[in-house]
Structures are given as C-alpha cells and as structure tokens.
UniProtKB/Swiss-Prot annotation:
Membrane topology, from the record: Multi-pass membrane protein
GO cellular component, one term: respiratory chain complex III
Record-given protein name: Cytochrome b
Lineage: Eukaryota, Metazoa, Chordata, Craniata, Vertebrata
Protein's GO biological process: mitochondrial electron transport, ubiquinol to cytochrome c
Job of this protein: Component of the ubiquinol-cytochrome c reductase complex (complex III or cytochrome b-c1 complex) that is part of the mitochondrial respiratory chain. The b-c1 complex mediates electron transfer from ubiquinol to cytochrome c. Contributes to the generation of a proton gradient across the mitochondrial membrane that is then used for ATP synthesis.
Main location as per UniProt: mitochondrion
Keywords: Electron transport, Heme, Iron, Membrane, Metal-binding, Mitochondrion, Mitochondrion inner membrane, Respiratory chain, Transmembrane, Transmembrane helix, Transport, Ubiquinone
Species of origin: Tragelaphus scriptus
Subcellular location: Mitochondrion inner membrane
Required cofactor names: heme b
List of residues binding heme b b566: H97, H196
Similarity field: Belongs to the cytochrome b family.
Length: 379
C-alpha cells in the first residue's frame, strides 16, 4: 500500500514542500529566515483577526477602540502588542532574508527573487496602512505626509492623492479604506509567498558556497524541520521579551495622543523599519527627486541580477565584496539612525552622504569589485 503522505493530493504537496524536499546539506542558519517569515505572517494574520473583531474604523472611535482592546478585552493588551511588535520581528526577518540573498547570490533565481521583491513592497504597504489604524498623532500625520508624496507625480499627482484620500484630507474615508486594504493584503502576501516557494522548489535552494549541490542533498525532514523549530523558538522568545517587558520600545509616544489635524507633531517619522528609506527621501531637497530616490532604494533590488559581474555566485570566497557588503549594512544602519533625527545641521549632510554611499555601493562599487576579483583569479 502506498504511503498516504505520497498519494493523497493535498498531502503530496505538503510532502514535496516540507518533508521529502531534497535540501543542500550545508545551508546555515541564514536559511532559517524563510520559515520564520512564514511564522511571522501566520502570527500577524491570527492576532490581526482578533484585533479586527474589536476595532472600529471610524475617526471618532478608532483611537478609543484600540484603548478598549488594551483595557477591557480579555488578553487584548497582549494581542495588540504581539501584533505591533510582530511587525518589527517580521521586518527584522525580512531584511536578514534579503541580505542573505544578496550575500550568497540567491538573486540568480530570477522568478523567486522578483516575487520576493514584490512581496517586500506588499509587506511595506501593509505595515504602513496598519500604522494608520490606531488613529494617533503619528498615524494621522504619517498617513498625511506619505500619501502626499504622490502629489509629486506630474500632472495627475494632486488628483491621485485626493482619490486615495477619498476627500480633501486624510479623514474617515481614508481610515476605512486603509482598514479594508490592511485586512486583505496579508492574504495576498500568503498567496504570493506560496508562489515564491513554488518557484524556489523548481530550482532547489542555494547554499553558502554558491556551487550546485545536486549530488549532496538531504531530506528536509527531520534535519531542517528541527532546525526551523529552534529558529521559531528563538523568534518567539525575542518577540515575547519585547511584548512583555518593553512593548513600546519600538513605537512612538506621539501615537498615544489622539489624531489632531490642527496640531502637527514636532518630528513626523515612520516606524523604525522604514527610517532608512525615509532618510533617503529627506536627503534630496527636491520633492519628486526624493520620491524617486525612495522608490528606487527598494526597486534597486530588481537590478541585482544585472549588476552581478562576478564569475562566482556567492560572496563566500570574495573578501573584497564581503567588505563592501558589510559597509553597505553599516550604511543602512546609519540611514536608519538619520531617519529618526530632526532635519538640522549635522544630520542633513550625514544623511546625504549615506544616501550617496548606498546607491554608489550597489550600482558602482560592487560590480567593479567583482570584476577586480575576477582578474585576481585570472578569469
């Protein structure tokens, strides 16, 4: 009799994806982030569902409904903070996952990589709209500032912004539609993640050496299932430490003040995971230029396969490229720091230099360094 795991139409899909999947024998913990992102997504959908049961998307009651969740709903406070800090964990895993892909040359799997970039944009859009929902000061002004950026688009800009707002300012219509989109997008993300996985399993996983590992594969279960469970436990440990000991560490105190269109907060800034892009946006004095730089700072990932000039796939045996990669990582941390600072003397120039460095490293220095390394090996 055939094993039900291998014969049942549904079980067969699960089996081929998570049990009998041939995986390289040498993939490191950097390959854990895919499964961690899956766990984050499930966690966000579940906590979000329970929050949506008590939330009201009306400008008059949105803020007080969130307060009601924290004070009156059974375990509402933990659900709310797991959802808020779960977003931070999601982005930590996302950036690590993308960084891993850049370091080990995983972007040569074109379909997988491009769907990954689309996923990144979708998750960023979802997180932005979710931040608007509590209707605090930073929610309102963040929504106003970021949606206003679209007015930089020539000719149709202003009409486009008013169409998104559903009026002449961020108001009830905006909040309601943002709630609707924030609810539906995670399911679209889940579907895209399955397509992402489908394309990955067409080629098989990359590995730290970047060399094909077809002759040295091991079954995913039990080797990588147990490894993923360890990663998941660490993720949940860090998340619960945040939730139970410092739930507001990564948030903005301004968001505990109800939204007031007549009072602008002194420093409008997004959540920490968008600060690097926000710093790039602010470093260009021109509005349209800033918006283009902001979009291109993420869209540049699409160009990674085109910018790959090395004869080797991975950076494992390329010390000069490794050095540049970690300079890029430090540069992104610098941009994140600058994004949270006020627009005044030392910060403006630091932000501009860090922004130039970001594009220079990816577009010029990395491809040039790869060519130099090729010449070292007489290739």
């Amino acid at each position: 009799m055939t094993n039900i795991r291998k014969s049942h139409p549904l079980m067969k899909i699960v089996n081929n994806a998570f049990i009998d999947l041939p995986a390289p024998s040498n993939i490191s913990s950097w390959w854990n982030f895919g499964s961690l992102l899956g766990i984050c997504l499930i966690l966000q959908i579940l906590t979000g569902l329970f929050l949506a049961m008590h939330y009201t998307s009306d400008t008059m009651t949105a803020f007080s409904s969130v307060t009601h969740i924290c004070r009156d709903v059974n375990h509402g406070w933990i659900i709310r903070y797991m959802h808020a800090n779960g977003a931070s964990m999601f982005f930590i895993c996302l950036y690590m996952h993308v960084g891993r892909g850049m370091y080990y040359g995983s972007y040569t799997f074109l379909e997988t990589w491009n769907i990954g970039v689309i996923l990144l944009f979708t998750v960023m859009a979802t997180a932005f709209m979710g931040y608007v929902l509590p209707w605090g000061q930073m929610s309102f002004w963040g929504a106003t500032v970021i949606t206003n950026l679209l007015s930089a688009i020539p000719y149709i800009g202003t009409s486009l912004v008013e169409w998104i707002w559903g009026g002449f300012s961020v108001d009830k219509a905006t909040l309601t539609r943002f709630f609707a989109f924030h609810f539906i997008l995670p399911f679209i993300i889940a579907a895209l993640a399955m397509v992402h996985l489908l394309f990955l399993h067409e080629t098989g996983s990359n590995n730290p050496t970047g060399i094909p590992s077809d002759m040295d594969k091991i079954p995913f279960h039990p080797y990588y299932t147990i490894k993923d469970i360890l990663g998941a436990l660490l993720l949940i440990l860090i998340l619960m430490l945040l939730v139970l000991f410092a739930p507001d560490l990564l948030g903005d105190p301004d968001n505990y003040t109800p939204a007031n269109p007549l009072n602008t907060p002194p420093h409008i800034k997004p959540e920490w995971y968008f600060l690097f892009a926000y710093a790039i946006l602010r470093s260009i004095p021109n509005k349209l230029g800033g918006v283009l730089a902001l979009v291109f700072s993420i869209l540049i990932l699409i160009l990674m396969p085109l910018l790959h000039t090395s004869k080797q796939r991975s950076m494992m045996f390329r010390p000069l490229s490794q050095c540049l990669f970690w300079i890029l990582a430090a540069d992104l941390l610098t941009l994140t720091w600058i994004g949270g600072q006020p627009v005044e003397h030392p910060y403006i120039i630091i932000g501009q230099l860090a922004s130039i460095m970001y594009f220079l490293i990816i577009l010029v220095l990395m491809p040039a360094t790869s060519m130099i390394e090729n010449s070292f090996l007489k290739w």
